Design a protein with these regions (language model features):
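Beta-strand-rich recognition/accessory modules
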Residues: 45, 80-82, 109-114, 149-195
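Long, charge-dense
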Residues: 127-150, 169-174
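Beta-strand-rich N-terminal accessory domains
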Residues: 1-48, 192
Length: 195
């Protein structure tokens, strides 16, 4: 069963050894995945001094709520970065024998969007990769029981990977920007499952 609990400065959702924590830093909500209490991945957030406002590396979230039902939990987030209004729905579901977190992002804008992505720093190296292509990445995880972590994008979104230092990998789910639309969409999913 997927559950939710209040933690210091936020909420944690998940089942068994797999959890996603949403934390408030006084400006925005960020989120991170953990397995058996060890950090697996954390969202990389936009920085006004560093990032081009037309190229969203991650949606900005300033409000958080949640709801439970139907065997799952949803985290509902909204926020704004410059002219971009972001919303994200994170749906947590138990999938015997694993957990799935499906993410549906919508960004409405009065400005130009050249790129839309959700970016994460994964605490795994390329040598931990089990499988990879333009739609997904799978890593082997060590633990009490061998398991895997999967990150996938739903078409037309795609996945990209880059080195994130000596002990990490930077990954993105990249949405297709529709220039004639004021609303852009991005769909991706995290999955944890035992081997």
């Amino acid at each position: 069963m997927v559950g939710i609990e209040e933690i210091e400065q936020g909420y944690a959702m998940g089942a068994g050894p797999f959890r996603m924590a949403f934390t408030w830093d006084g400006v925005r909500w960020s989120h991170a995945l953990a397995f058996e209490g060890r950090l697996l991945a954390s969202s990389l957030e936009m920085e006004p001094q560093r990032d081009d406002p037309a190229r969203l590396i991650s949606p900005a979230y300033q409000q958080f709520s949640h709801q439970e039902g139907g065997g799952g939990v949803q985290a509902l987030l909204v926020g704004q970065w410059g002219p971009h209004h972001c919303s994200g729905v994170f749906t947590f579901e138990f999938q015997n024998p694993g957990v799935s977190i499906a993410v549906d992002v919508a960004v409405r804008s009065r400005g130009v969007i050249e790129a839309l992505a959700a970016t994460y720093l994964v605490q795994r190296t390329s040598s931990d990769l089990r499988d990879a292509n333009a739609s997904m990445m799978v890593w082997d995880l060590e633990g009490q029981k061998p398991s895997r972590l999967r990150f996938e994008a739903r078409a037309p979104s795609v996945v990209s990977l880059a080195e994130g230092g000596r002990q990490a990998t930077c990954i993105q789910a990249n949405g297709r920007v529709e220039s004639e639309s004021s609303t852009q969409r991005l769909y991706y999913r995290w999955q944890w499952f035992p081997c």
